[in-house]
Amino acid sequence: MSDTICAIATAIVPQQGSVGIVRLSGSEALALAKRVFRLRGKQAFESHRIHYGHFLDADGGILDECLVLYMQAPRSFTREDVVEFHCHGGIAVIQQILRRCVELGARLARPGEFTLRAFLNGRIDLTEAEAVAELVSARSPEAARLAVGGLAGKLAGEVRQLRSGCLDLLAELEARLDFEDDLPPLDTGAVRANIGQSLAHARRLMATSTRGELLRTGLKVAIVGRPNVGKSSLLNAWSRTDRAIVTDLPGTTRDVVESMLNVQGIPVQVLDTAGIREATDTVERIGIERSHAAAREADLVLLVIDRTEGWTCADSDIFAQVRERPVIVVVNKSDLEGPPVYTPSRGVLATVPTAAPVGDGIDALEGAILAALGQEAFSVADGDFAVNERQYEALVRAEVALVRVVETVEAALPIDFWTIDLRAAAHALGEVTGESVTEAVLERIFSKFCIGK
């Protein structure tokens, strides 16, 4: 990490922002800044102060009028000297500034390299590093709040406490291997109780993964049904937009229409599909095929029926095609009269009446979706956190090792066997926080970060 790295730290989007940031980190960051930035007046670079001036090109001409922020090591995110140029947001300006930094010896940063340096320099642990990426990619306020809990070190504190308990017991057992004659008899009941508490603790941490996965990856919901039952009206009412075209003509929707919604913090991708019937032309046939594909790929299917017509044979046919997925039946046009609605007694998670044009039943529909996920009271409080897939896998290995410890104790095997599995549990827990992690794992984790973070 002896070289100085640089990257654009702000998002590059088609709609150019008003401000762009180019970030440097490394021992030569300040020296480079002094070569390219002309401070206004008699200012001198001071740590943690914003300075105004001009960024210069190779000929001494002005590239941009901007601000510069210098953060002296170790009081920076990476614990190295860090310099940020806050310039105008046009991509041409930002790229010229970045190119000039490279010309003077800085290296383009790899994805996540700033955060990697923060980890390697002891500024943050691995759970906090991963929380940085989760905060950047959060798609709802609840997901962001969950990431902040991890960034604050809540998860790391829990795992370190758990690992410390394993190491304390391991130290005691290894001492007995060396000085057994000098110590009182070992209370195996206390050992089992100790391991039992550690197992319960690990399982509590593992239980947070479901909520975290929902907030990170979201849910895909397909709206299916016969033509003209109100699928597009339901999407428009739910999204509070005119996302889909609505007419009285059956078969208006010919393709899958997507909309992103937020259901109590859970990102939900809703797919409004073409009405399923015998196709009358090639275009409609392709649309219906895509409807079937959307239903197969969905996490949850909303089967919409028409209250004025009741449950029809065509509805039964569609249900038979989608019943392998979790299904909620939506009885639309419930404000109108119609025959009694008899839905299948098996294979349906819930039946929800709606009147899409006036928005009735949307709250009940969202409640049914949350209930289907086992999340009837979904909320994220300050300080909450959730383990990600990598952390969960490491906790599973710790759990397996701890279960083996209990089994070896109960089988009255020699203490040597206990220590093998205790050491494995401690190692797995160390992988969560980064205290025992390989370079390959680090590379895999940080390669998923955006460049400049």
Swiss-Prot record:
Entry-linked PROSITE patterns: G_TRME (PS51709)
Q: Give the keywords, sorted.
A: Cytoplasm, GTP-binding, Hydrolase, Magnesium, Metal-binding, Nucleotide-binding, Potassium, tRNA processing
Q: What are the cysteine partners in each disulfide bond?
A: none
List locations, semicolon-separated: Cytoplasm
Residues annotated as binding Mg(2+) = 232, 253
The main location is cytoplasm
One example of a Gene Ontology biological process annotation: tRNA methylation
Q: Name one GO cellular component term.
A: cytosol
- Which residues does (6S)-5-formyl-5,6,7,8-tetrahydrofolate bind? 23, 84, 123, 453
InterPro entries, alphabetized: G_TrmE, GTP-bd, GTP-bd_TrmE_N, GTPase_MnmE, MnmE_dom2, MnmE_helical, P-loop_NTPase, Small_GTP-bd
Any GO molecular function: metal ion binding
Enzyme class, one word?
A: hydrolase
Q: Which Pfam families match?
A: MMR_HSR1 (PF01926), MnmE_helical (PF12631), TrmE_N (PF10396)
Task: Kindly list the positions annotated as binding K(+).
Answer: 228, 247, 249, 252
**What are the binding positions for GTP in this chain?**
228-233, 247-253, 272-275
Q: Name the source's superkingdom.
A: Bacteria
Q: How is the cofactor bound?
A: Binds 1 potassium ion per subunit.
Job of this protein: Exhibits a very high intrinsic GTPase hydrolysis rate. Involved in the addition of a carboxymethylaminomethyl (cmnm) group at the wobble position (U34) of certain tRNAs, forming tRNA-cmnm(5)s(2)U34.
The family this protein is said to belong to: Belongs to the TRAFAC class TrmE-Era-EngA-EngB-Septin-like GTPase superfamily. TrmE GTPase family.
The name of this protein is tRNA modification GTPase MnmE
The gene coding this protein: mnmE
